[in-house]
Swiss-Prot record:
Gene name linked to the record: queF
Name under which the protein is recorded: NADPH-dependent 7-cyano-7-deazaguanine reductase
Pfam families in UniProt: QueF
Pathway terms, separated by semicolons: tRNA modification; tRNA-queuosine biosynthesis
Gene Ontology terms, MF aspect: preQ1 synthase activity
List of catalytic residues: C56, D63
First-tier enzyme category under EC: oxidoreductase
Family the UniProt entry places it in: Belongs to the GTP cyclohydrolase I family. QueF type 1 subfamily.
Annotated keywords: Cytoplasm, NADP, Oxidoreductase, Queuosine biosynthesis
Role: Catalyzes the NADPH-dependent reduction of 7-cyano-7-deazaguanine (preQ0) to 7-aminomethyl-7-deazaguanine (preQ1).
Keyword Phosphoprotein included in the entry's annotation: no
GO cellular component: cytoplasm
């Protein structure tokens, strides 16, 4: 017997299900959160953004990264459409690789207060040097399984 899908009513406070303009800047972007229906269970959520872009704050040239965001949720989850819009807001933002990566991790952590969060920013080379940036909050919950982020050391990533 098939089960009918749960219907969640549209919420005017969420961007999900709404026509939304792309935010002009990361500060203007809104990150939405939704209640975690499995709040009593330790588990891992992974977001992968293999085509993240920002701008060099000095030259204005585009910078490209493969971001991997892992977190152990508490009471809240990041709503994925709002995360997509937030990450896209960096497209015209001038920021060094380190600042972009750490700012994203801190912003998500501040919004949802996870039990644990880490971000890996694997930046493609500019001037022949790839830059990888890693940041995390606190300690991983005991017994939590966290797979490798799966981004190979630079040899022409892809």
């Amino acid at each position: 017997m098939s089960r009918s899908p749960r219907k969640t009513p549209k919420s005017p406070s969420l961007q999900l299900g709404q026509a939304v303009e792309w935010p002009a800047t990361p500060d203007a972007a809104r990150l939405d959160r939704v209640p975690n229906p499995q709040a009593g269970t330790d588990y891992l959520v992974r977001f992968t953004a293999p085509e993240f872009t920002s701008l060099c704050p000095v030259t204005g040239q585009p910078d490209f990264a493969h971001l991997v965001i892992d977190y152990a949720p508490g009471a809240w989850l990041v709503e994925s459409k709002s995360l997509k819009l937030y990450l896209a807001s960096f497209r015209n933002h001038g920021g060094f690789h380190e600042d972009c990566t750490v700012s994203i991790g801190k912003r998500i952590a501040a919004e949802i207060k996870p039990k644990w969060l880490r971000i890996g920013g694997y930046w493609y080379p500019r001037g022949g040097i790839p830059i990888d940036v890693f940041w995390q909050t606190g300690k991983l919950p005991k017994g939590m399984w966290v797979p490798d982020q799966g981004v190979a050391p630079y040899r022409g990533r892809g």
